[in-house]
From Swiss-Prot:
Expressing tissues: Highly expressed in muscle, heart, kidney and brain.
Listed name of the protein: Acylglycerol kinase, mitochondrial
Lineage of origin: Eukaryota, Metazoa, Chordata, Craniata, Vertebrata
Organism: Homo sapiens
Residues in DAGKc domain copies: 58-199
Keywords associated with the record: Acetylation, ATP-binding, Cardiomyopathy, Cataract, Disease variant, Kinase, Lipid metabolism, Membrane, Mitochondrion, Mitochondrion inner membrane, Nucleotide-binding, Primary mitochondrial disease, Transferase
PROSITE patterns (alphabetical): DAGK
Stored InterPro entries: AGK_C, ATP-NAD_kinase_N, Diacylglycerol_kinase_cat_dom, Lipid_Phosphate_FormReg, NAD/diacylglycerol_kinase_sf
Lipid bilayer topology: Peripheral membrane protein
Enzyme class: transferase
Record field: catalytic activity: a monoacylglycerol + ATP = a monoacyl-sn-glycero-3-phosphate + ADP + H(+); a 1,2-diacyl-sn-glycerol + ATP = a 1,2-diacyl-sn-glycero-3-phosphate + ADP + H(+); an N-acylsphing-4-enine + ATP = an N-acylsphing-4-enine 1-phosphate + ADP + H(+); 1-(9Z-octadecenoyl)-sn-glycerol + ATP = 1-(9Z-octadecenoyl)-sn-glycero-3-phosphate + ADP + H(+)
Alphabetized SUPFAM superfamilies for the sequence: NAD kinase/diacylglycerol kinase-like (SSF111331)
A Pfam match: DAGK_cat
Subunit structure, as described in the record: Component of the TIM22 complex, which core is composed of TIMM22, associated with TIMM10 (TIMM10A and/or TIMM10B), TIMM9, AGK and TIMM29. Interacts with SMIM26.
Metabolic or biological pathway, per its Swiss-Prot or TrEMBL entry: Lipid metabolism; glycerolipid metabolism
């Protein structure tokens, strides 16, 4: 024993290195063990749903998964197969997995896809935007858009996950919670933005549109990867050296919020009325005064024009802060002032990379149901629509309130109902 301790003392550098390696290895193994426990618990919970008997005249739910293997730097396929796929199969659903090979493929596949009971998106913001756009571009979108959508956050940017699921620092738990939310079946309606250019078909967004200097600097962060934790500040610092002040000139026309209609009552099966009642109803509708004669004049929409000079403009939905009790539906137009200093640009820009909802002090926010953004010719630059880059051009943006139903964590849904946004 004495020889053992003497050896450790004489080789203290190797001992220290070995102890550090052993500690790290133990921590890594413990983390893997905890992840396996989370997966097992989630699978057991899903199996309860899979063991439930279905009525003889009912069919097994069909779920179509759109998986983007390239998401999360190529790790999405492994993350899905280890953490989400077993839960979906154990839940009793008939699961079909479609792996996308190139950008835009999901949109094309959805135009040809037959009916399904559930649509599941396994990827990030870009994959989700493709699927939503594909759904809403269909000729039968009025009925097809009623199919609930599940979102399994596998990408580097998954903005909607904060709205639909509880916060979690553990990647495995976050994925299993999102998958279990699909199995449990609780849904929440979300707004959609329809963004239409002059020539192309409309694009649909769940989060919003950004145009400005903060966005331009943020997309260049990966270029300075070799600077490690300083890469975000470096991207914004070098952006200030090219041009200052950085202003974006444009004009915007918009209309105010619209009144939210009451929730439609749940459809309940009713007995067919007797032949006598049906004849009376037909006669009453035949002799009734035409509806056009009773219609009242609808006041025309009031459009307001704003000339703006901004460092960044954003047009966003309220999906990040849902308020089920709100009496109005609107999108937010945020115009950030172009009078900030270089130091504030670097500081605030670094924070906006992690939290795009953050705004500069003095930002003007407008509420609208639709708007038209006009950009001067030759302005250049790019839009960021749900974290995907598009060429900047004049666009019409229209809010489609509560257009799509998304699966959400029951705990999160209960929190929305009991603690509405102020």
């Amino acid at each position: 024993m004495t020889v053992f301790f003497k050896t450790l003392r004489n080789h203290w550098k190797k001992t220290t290195a070995g102890l550090c390696l052993l500690t790290w290895g133990g921590h890594w193994l413990y983390g893997k063990h905890c992840d396996n426990l989370l997966r097992r618990a989630a699978c057991q919970e899903a199996q309860v749903f899979g063991n439930q008997l279905i009525p003889p005249n009912a069919q097994v739910k069909k779920a179509t998964v759109f998986l983007n293997p390239a998401a999360c730097k190529g790790k999405a396929r492994t993350l899905f197969e280890k953490n989400a796929a077993p839960i979906l199969h154990l839940s009793g659903m008939d699961v079909t997995i479609v792996k996308t090979d190139y950008e835009g493929q999901a949109k094309k596949l959805l135009e040809l896809m037959e009916n399904t009971d559930v649509i599941i998106v396994a990827g990030g913001d870009g994959t989700l935007q493709e699927v939503v756009t594909g759904v809403l571009r269909r000729t039968d979108e009025a009925t097809f858009s009623k199919i609930p959508i599940g979102f399994i956050p596998l990408g580097e940017t998954s903005s909607l996950s904060h709205t639909l699921f509880a916060e979690s620092g553990n990647k495995v738990q976050h994925i299993t919670d999102a998958t279990l939310a699909i199995v449990k079946g609780e849904t929440v309606p979300l707004d959609v933005l329809q963004i239409k250019g002059e020539k192309e078909q409309p694009v649909f967004a769940m989060t919003g549109l950004r145009w400005g200097s903060f966005r331009d600097a943020g997309v260049k962060v990966s270029k300075y990867w070799y600077l490690g934790p300083l890469k975000i500040k470096a991207a914004h610092f070098f952006s200030t050296l090219k041009e200052w002040p950085q202003t974006h000139q444009a004009s915007i026309s918009y209309t105010g919020p619209t009144e939210r209609p009451p929730n439609e009552p749940e459809e309940t099966p009713v007995q067919r009325p007797s032949l006598y009642r049906r004849i009376l109803r037909r006669l009453a509708s035949y002799w009734a005064q035409p509806q056009d004669a009773l219609s009242q004049e609808v006041s025309p929409e009031v459009w307001k024009d704003v000339q703006l000079s901004t460092i960044e403009l954003s047009i966003t939905t309220r999906n990040n802060q849902l308020d089920p009790t709100s009496k109005e539906d609107f999108l937010n137009i945020c115009i950030e002032p172009d009078t900030i200093s270089k130091g504030d640009f670097i500081t605030i820009g670094s924070r906006k990379v992690r939290n795009p909802k953050l705004h500069v002090e003095g930002t003007e926010c407008l509420q609208a149901s639709q708007c038209t953004l006009l950009i001067p010719e030759g302005a250049g630059g790019s839009f960021s629509i749900d974290s995907e880059e598009y060429e900047a051009m004049p666009v019409e943006v229209k809010l489609l309130p509560r257009k799509l139903q998304f699966f959400c964590d029951p705990r999160k849904r209960e929190q929305m109902l009991t603690s509405p946004t102020q």
